[in-house]
Amino acid sequence: MKEKIAKISILANVILAGGKISVGILSNSASVFAEGIHSLMDVFSSLISFFGIKISKKPADKEHPYGHFKFEVLAGFLITLILLGTGLGIIYEAYQKFKNPSLIKIPILALSVMIFSALINEIMARLKIHFGKKENSVALISDGVHSRVDVFASLVVFVGLILNKYWIFTDSVLAFLIGLYIIKESFSIGKEAIDSL
């Protein structure tokens, strides 16, 4: 069941990433676009982790007498670098948007995609936490908590889209904060990878 939930989660994040990135571009919203990139990074992180764990479970062989567990650590470092680069890119784009602010086009579309994102992430959070507890999987519970954090991120962007009407810099400030959050996440994952050595 763990693998099934992981696959559903990856599929959900692919749909959310595509929706948010498209709507972010169409509506000229840096924060919605940044959230889309964040969802896309969740997909890459999940895939890298999935394959890293799969390889690390291989038994020891002639070339790897101590096993393959370091592949999982290597996957963690790769995720760290991807997230760090993404966070820095989002911060740069937010800064550019802050220098040249503009109103969000089609705000109803941007608002709709963020509410949809919050609902999907809440459903995924509940599923992961439920099955994580049922199957005693710390990884699944942790991923469920991560999905719950994504719910709050979507709601913050939703509120920001409403406030952007009153303060034009809201969107770029939120995109900047999302970029900082992604960088913070990259350091957390990097620390976990180092600690597991």
Predicted segments — roles?
Residues 1-197:
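Alpha-helical transmembrane cores and adjacent cytosolic helix/loop segments
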